[in-house]
């Protein structure tokens, strides 16, 4: 079973993430940031990842530390659940539409952190959620999961739709990349023999 639990405690946040990469999309989310919970739900449902996230942060200041640290902890949990990366497909991509919005996400479990984030948001906030925090979430994830991640919103007018398509596509790309390939069982998906 590819299950992991990670706890991260700092002076700014206390976070627990538990996940099962071979789940059915069940989720239990309580980050204290409602829009983040909504986006994490998209990852769980579209990635078929069972996901529990509990976070307590200094949201009286703003949501930055909580959102970033949830991304960090999720990245650590994914890396822990995958282990040595033997037998995974390694690459995943997805295009997801939502009404007028369309996003593409491509992921590579390369062991080399890298983020290309190109989302021309049409407004700065979705409700009370600062859209810039989505970059911090994905940067935290990338740096601690050891992945290269390309995120492109190809079109969109509604900022909520833009970001929701990003998170849905991320969940689907993640699902594809961590899927076990029977033909490559026990093999590292790299000509170098390591990731």
Curated annotation (Swiss-Prot):
Pathway: Amino-acid biosynthesis; L-histidine biosynthesis; L-histidine from 5-phospho-alpha-D-ribose 1-diphosphate: step 6/9. Coiled coil: none annotated. Its main location: cytoplasm. It is found in: Cytoplasm. The keyword Secreted does not apply. Disulfide bonds: none annotated. It catalyses: D-erythro-1-(imidazol-4-yl)glycerol 3-phosphate = 3-(imidazol-4-yl)-2-oxopropyl phosphate + H2O. This is Imidazoleglycerol-phosphate dehydratase. It comes from Burkholderia orbicola (strain MC0-3).
């Amino acid at each position: 079973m590819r299950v992991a639990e990670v706890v991260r405690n700092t002076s700014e946040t206390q976070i627990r993430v538990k996940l099962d990469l071979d789940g059915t999309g069940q989720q239990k989310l309580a980050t204290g940031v409602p829009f983040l919970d909504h986006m994490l739900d998209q990852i769980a449902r579209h990635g078929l990842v069972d996901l529990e996230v509990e976070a307590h942060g200094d949201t009286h200041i703003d949501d930055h530390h909580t959102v970033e640290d949830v991304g960090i902890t999720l990245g650590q949990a994914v890396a822990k659940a995958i282990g040595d990366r033997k037998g995974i497909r390694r690459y995943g991509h997805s295009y997801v539409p939502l009404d007028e919005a369309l996003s593409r996400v491509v992921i590579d479990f390369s062991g080399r952190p890298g983020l290309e984030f190109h989302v021309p948001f049409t407004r700065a906030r979705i409700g009370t959620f600062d859209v810039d925090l989505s970059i911090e979430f994905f940067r935290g994830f990338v740096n601690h999961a050891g992945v290269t991640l390309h995120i492109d919103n190809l079109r969109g007018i509604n900022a909520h739709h833009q970001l929701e398509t990003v998170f849905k596509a991320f969940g689907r790309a993640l699902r594809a990349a961590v899927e076990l390939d029977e033909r490559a069982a026990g093999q590292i998906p790299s000509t170098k023999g390591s990731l």
